[in-house]
Amino acid sequence: MLPCDLLIPCGYYNQVVPRILYTAFDVVPSPKGASTHILHFLRGLVNSQFDVHLFTPGDGLLPSEDSIEGAKVTRVPQNLQDNFLARAVHFGGAVLAHVAVAQAYDIVHYRSLWGGFQLAQSKSRFGYKTIFEVNGLPSVELKYHYPGLEPDLLTKIKEQELASLHLSDAIICPSRVTRDYLASLGLDRKTVTVIPNGVSPSDFFPSPLPERINRVPVMLYIGTLADWQGLDVLIKSIPLIIEKHPIQLKIVGRGRSRQRKLLAKQIRKLGLEEHVIVQPPVPHHEVPALIAEADICVAPLGLNDRNVTQGACPIKVLEYMAAGRPLLASNMPIVRELVRDDIDGLLFSPNDPEDLARQALALLENLELSQRLAESAAERALSKFTWHEAQKRLGKVYEKLLENE
């Protein structure tokens, strides 16, 4: 009999340790939110006494065979000179080749089309159940990274996504907006389990707001430089803010060369070189200290199909909240699933630099308001949005699949 564990109740299995393959076309570990998500799901599965094998791409630095959180890790070598699609197709082929020779898996859990399409098609051949974890779909997101993609290619990708979704035994996603989008593609809403992202209270916890005397307040953005993040609107708001109150904007995150160049050009054009600092990403364990130095944290998500139609669950918002920082964020459904306006943060009209500036000034000029919002945000994030809770929800999905074997 397996011991009682985090996800599955005592006495559930008869001496058999379920074998799980977890695949993700994301480098792990890395500063990205996807890596944080994967590591916490991995920890929950291992703590439930599953035999877990994580399959990810390599980055040329991390070892090809490894162990994380007690799970075996295989990193598929990549030719980093190849384009994204070539690397994605190569990864999918490597995953399927592994399944063909590996000891049988009970559940195969995939986070993307890359590998997921082949694995969904092959489930009857190899006898496993499948979980499709939908955090983002290439048919929606790729055009923001690669604006020159042919429409026919995106159509083909969407067809493969639809096939993968309908072939999967279970689907999980991080927001109700995403669930509704999947339902619009013909899936039964009841078959999709929403598991929001979370925070770890041991890493993110409230600290006193910095003193504002004799110093320039810091507004912090942490995240990718992807076009859907709304950073152009954030930059446009800075001149409006500094007309009335000094501020320094610090942007910390990963971006492609094109994205960094566009951001730098906008900063120069507006003459904001002394007011805006752009820094490369930091390891995730350094994020709490960065947030602790900030006076305001911001998530300026843009009004676009990635955020409004497909949906997401921005980890940055939850981490800002848990760390007890005044939050500014776009007023859209994926944010309102996490944040109550004027209770846990101030929400501004998306794509509106004037409204963003107005809300930022309200926080800069009213310390009592900032403290009230920060305290409420921390309490909400640490009580309702933890990785422990996400792991429990994931466990129920696994339990249901294994019951039906």
Residue map of PLM features:
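Nucleotide-activated donor-binding/catalytic signature segment of Leloir-type glycosyltransferases, i.e.
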Residues: K261-A289, I296
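Membrane-proximal helix-turn-helix segments that form the acceptor-binding/catalytic region
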Residues: L96-A102, F117, Q121-R125, F132, ...
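Conserved acidic donor-binding segment of nucleotide-sugar-dependent glycosyltransferases
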Residues: V317, D341-D342, L346-P353, A362-E368
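A short, well-ordered alpha-helix in the C-terminal region of glycosyltransferases
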Residues: D355, A362, L369-K384, R393-K396
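Short hydrophobic beta-strand element within catalytic cores of glycosyltransferases
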Residues: C297-A299, E319-A322, P326-A329
